[in-house]
């Protein structure tokens, strides 16, 4: 149950907000989570792990709902979290009821009469009790079902995906409690026909053979996919991450970066029409077309190149793919790549040197060191050795 709540916190609560709101939420939860300086830079996945440890009852869903109701623009997500929590709670109650019912079915009845070797003998009272009637009906039904159900494991094994839990569930459905061998001279209902039992077994076998598939990515891409030149075709993607608009030239023209993904790969995007910022919301599904691939980026210049998808078909982006797309690259990896590649991550400043009209920062991690030259208005940013520097290049 806690894992279900954690899924809601991570996928709906933390992945559903932008970076600015995430930093705000992290700041407001810092005392409850007891974040230190190193943990201040934790991403959404690590914060979800901390919340699961701090709030073992519901992984922090209630805390997020309270916070989101107070933050402008996050009211809808608060309501969504509330609904998801209610669904998870109902689902958990349903599972407990099913387990209790199954346990009652598997327990032998203490009120059943003792069996006798004379099957034609009449009951002493001259009539059957309700328990006796149930036992009389279950014996032929169960025996026929057990004969017919033998083909179900063969059907299920052809798929190679049958879980032991599904087998136990199937067993509890088709097996009756222990019944006495004593029979009565009166049977209220006709026994279940062999054809009916066979059809039921066959239907259960088909259900068992086709369990729900969990999407798993065999080869998780470590680098963004690239496309070159003008691309007229459309691509259905989910927005994973978006930056705030920033000026990219001396005229003050603005753009923003985004990371989007299909179910098997992810892409870096440059958007030069900031009107589209309203559409680029984390976890939103979009269709992009008529874009230009250049230097590892998808460049979008016009609002007409992006449209919202409302077909009702969800996109399931594997968590491993999300992690790969949001991971800060290592220094040795960046040094091995060509100039002009996309960089988005948080790095530690080891050294700072002012060189006239620009500043040279030396950043590093456990794999090496790299120099970063900063020009123009960015030289006014207060950043010193030991500080963390977020780079979006």
UniProtKB/Swiss-Prot annotation:
Residues 219-393 form the HIN-200 domain. It comes from the Eukaryota. GO terms for cellular component: nucleus. One of its GO terms (biological process) is activation of innate immune response. Residues 82-188 are annotated as: Disordered. It is found in: Nucleus. Residues 1-87 form the Pyrin domain. The keyword RNA-binding does not apply. CDD domains: Pyrin. Residues 152-169 have a biased composition (Low complexity). InterPro entries: DAPIN, DEATH-like_dom_sf, HIN-200, HIN200/IF120x, NA-bd_OB-fold. Residues 108-118, 126-151, 170-186 have a biased composition (Polar residues). Its main location: nucleus. Residues 87-102 have a biased composition (Basic residues). Keywords: Nucleus. Belongs to the HIN-200 family. This is Pyrin and HIN domain-containing protein 1-like. It comes from Mus musculus. The gene is Ifi214.
């Amino acid at each position: 149950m806690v894992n279900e709540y954690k899924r809601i916190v991570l996928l709906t609560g933390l992945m559903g907000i932008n970076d600015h709101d995430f930093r705000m939420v992290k700041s407001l939860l810092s005392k409850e989570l007891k974040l230190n300086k190193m943990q201040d830079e934790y991403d959404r996945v690590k914060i979800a792990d901390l919340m699961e440890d701090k709030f073992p009852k519901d992984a922090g869903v209630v805390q997020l709902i309270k916070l989101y109701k107070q933050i402008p623009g996050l009211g809808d997500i608060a309501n969504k979290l509330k609904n998801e929590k209610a669904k998870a709670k109902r689902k958990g109650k349903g599972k407990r009821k099913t387990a209790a019912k199954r346990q009652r079915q598997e327990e032998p009845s203490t009120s059943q009469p003792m069996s006798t070797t004379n099957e034609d003998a009449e009951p002493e009272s001259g009539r059957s009790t309700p328990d006796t009637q149930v036992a009389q009906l279950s014996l032929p039904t169960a025996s026929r079902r057990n004969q017919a159900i033998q083909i179900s494991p063969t059907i299920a094994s052809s798929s190679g995906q049958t879980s032991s839990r599904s087998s136990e569930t199937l067993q509890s459905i088709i097996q009756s409690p222990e019944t006495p061998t004593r029979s009565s001279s009166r049977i209220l209902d006709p026994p279940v026909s062999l054809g009916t039992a066979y059809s039921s077994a066959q239907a259960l076998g088909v259900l068992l053979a086709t369990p729900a598939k969990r999407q798993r990515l065999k080869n998780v891409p470590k680098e963004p996919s690239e496309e070159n030149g003008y691309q007229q075709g459309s691509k259905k993607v989910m927005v994973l991450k978006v930056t705030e608009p920033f000026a990219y030239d001396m005229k003050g023209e603005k753009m923003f970066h985004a990371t989007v993904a299909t179910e098997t790969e992810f892409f870096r995007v440059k958007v030069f029409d900031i009107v589209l910022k309203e559409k680029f919301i984390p976890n939103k599904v979009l269709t992009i077309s008529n874009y230009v691939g250049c230097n590892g980026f998808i460049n979008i210049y016009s609002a007409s190149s992006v449209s919202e998808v409302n077909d009702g078909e969800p996109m399931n982006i594997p968590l491993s793919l999300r992690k790969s797309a949001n991971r800060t690259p290592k220094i040795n990896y960046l040094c091995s790549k060509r100039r002009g590649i996309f960089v988005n991550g948080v790095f530690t400043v080891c050294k700072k040197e002012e060189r006239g009209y620009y500043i040279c920062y030396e950043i590093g991690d456990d794999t090496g060191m790299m120099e970063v030259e900063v020009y123009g208005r960015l030289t006014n940013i207060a950043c010193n050795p030991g500080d963390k520097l977020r780079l979006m290049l």
